[in-house]
């Protein structure tokens, strides 16, 4: 088997492949609603004890975000108390419970197929449980990979988590399309005509009564696989040292790095870890500010305004088949995520973030000045795609890399939790504000604002974010002690 300085590359790769399944589930769970929401809307419009308004539909479509915020906020406490590995096992169990419960919210208690307010509440509880799993995985998966990877390839390996997120979103788009098949056209037609009851005996009826259940239920396959496989990987060496299990830590390090390198890395870890945890501001305020602002900028640059509403945007531009453009954009996103994976250790984190910020600014400003001009709709489409792919080789993967490695060992669990919680909060702010802002202020104002934020993000990275390329996680403790 191929080795890395006496360690097993195959062993390291197998660990990372299992860990990034958490990223795939992150993408899968957040995107599955895109195909299911029309059928779900039509199903609950058949309720007789309440009116399924736009408010209820908006809440149901985004209820998982509540769980994401809760899960990310709890991730630090759990990652410290239970460990990185057991926290990921818990996330896998939550993904599975959510998929099963969302598929069959009646769960042998409520009448099957009878839409009412109680069923809607139960369905949203299951979606929130899945969101908690997403929140835990979004914080702990990159942390786990960052703590187990050798420093020379850490950025590349953590970047695979972002690839898995985008791949999970792409997979569920195809799964949803496969499940709906020929049912999709009559479904959209029925919902679009303001249908208030289930239409029996039509293709739309199957999608309304059953199709959305299959979509949510399909997540049980990767969720079950992740929950089982994560039990087979080791705990991270950094966490093992923090809880006094030096021998176990050395064995894990030896299998990854070889015996000689393992002893050196273990000694370095022990020099910077004198206790399990320290107070969050032990290394000064700037350490936390940098991590939190990385998360805030990743969302404030407005990427989810494109990822969540791409079909709406392309349709507003005047394109006939917005779904095809959305899928094409998704394939491009996957390809440009690979750019980051294979260049992050050569070019460094900061150059990619700055280049991506400027590319996004150019794309956003391009959209601002071409949107709604029929003669320039092709240029507008190119601008949207430039905006999107610039994120995919920069802020998409690199933000996760930096959050996983910029904090010192003894505060990483709590600090990552704070940073990722801010990420989900701003995800919600951007996602819920885009449509009202675009409708009231116009697309020119909205995308000009995103462009300005992108420029501010580039300045922030240039001036305040440390370059972590080639540095060990223990170097971060020494760096922030000097900066304090």
Where are these regions (language model features)?
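Alpha-helical transmembrane bundle of multi-pass membrane proteins
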Residues: 1-248, 254, 271-484
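Short helix/loop segments within enzyme catalytic domains
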Residues: 256-258
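Short, well-structured alpha-helical segments
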Residues: 262-271
């Amino acid at each position: 088997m191929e080795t890395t300085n006496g360690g097993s590359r195959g062993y390291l790769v197998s660990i990372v492949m299992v860990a990034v399944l958490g990223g795939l589930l992150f993408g899968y769970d957040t995107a599955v609603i895109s195909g299911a929401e029309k059928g779900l809307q039509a199903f609950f419009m058949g309720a007789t004890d309440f009116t399924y308004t736009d408010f209820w539909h908006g809440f149901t479509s985004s209820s998982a975000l509540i769980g994401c915020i809760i899960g990310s906020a709890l991730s630090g406490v759990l990652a410290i108390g239970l460990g990185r590995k057991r926290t990921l096992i818990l996330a896998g169990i939550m993904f599975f419970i959510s998929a099963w419960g969302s598929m069959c919210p009646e769960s042998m208690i409520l009448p099957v197929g009878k839409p009412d307010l109680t069923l809607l509440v139960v369905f949203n509880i299951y979606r929130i449980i899945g969101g908690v799993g997403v929140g835990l995985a979004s914080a702990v998966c990159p942390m786990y990979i960052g703590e187990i990877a050798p420093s020379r390839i850490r950025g590349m390996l953590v970047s695979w988590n972002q690839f898995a997120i985008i791949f999970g979103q792409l997979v569920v788009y195809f799964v949803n399309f496969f499940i709906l098949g020929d049912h999709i056209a009559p479904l959209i037609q029925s919902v679009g005509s303001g249908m208030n009851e289930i239409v029996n005996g039509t293709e739309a009826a199957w999608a309304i009564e059953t199709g959305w259940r299959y979509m949510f239920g399909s997540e049980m396959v990767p969720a079950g696989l992740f929950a089982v496989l994560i039990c087979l990987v080791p705990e991270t060496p950094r966490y093992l040292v923090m809880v006094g299990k030096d021998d176990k830590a050395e064995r894990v390090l030896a299998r990854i790095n070889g015996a000689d390198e393992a002893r050196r890395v273990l000694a370095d870890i022990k020099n910077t870890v004198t206790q399990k945890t320290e107070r969050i501001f032990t290394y000064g305020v700037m350490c936390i500010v940098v991590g939190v602002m990385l998360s805030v900028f990743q969302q404030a640059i407005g990427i989810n305004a494109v990822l969540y509403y791409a079909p709406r945007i392309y349709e507003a531009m005047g394109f006939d088949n917005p779904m095809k453009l959305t899928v094409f954009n998704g394939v491009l996103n996957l390809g440009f995520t690979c750019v980051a994976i294979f260049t992050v250790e050569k070019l460094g984190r900061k150059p990619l973030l700055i280049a991506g910020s400027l590319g996004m600014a150019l794309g956003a400003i391009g959209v601002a000045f071409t949107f709604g001009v029929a003669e320039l709709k092709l240029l507008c489409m190119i601008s949207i795609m430039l905006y999107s792919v610039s994120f995919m080789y920069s802020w998409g993967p690199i933000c996760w890399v930096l959050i996983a490695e910029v904090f010192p060992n003894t505060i990483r669990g709590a600090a990552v939790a704070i940073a990722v919680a801010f990420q989900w909060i701003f995800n919600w702010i951007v996602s819920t504000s885009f449509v009202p802002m675009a409708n009231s202020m116009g697309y020119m104002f909205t995308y000009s604002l995103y462009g300005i934020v992108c420029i501010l993000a580039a300045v922030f990275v240039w001036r305040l974010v440390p370059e972590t390329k080639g540095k060990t996680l223990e170097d971060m403790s020494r760096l922030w002690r000097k900066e304090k």
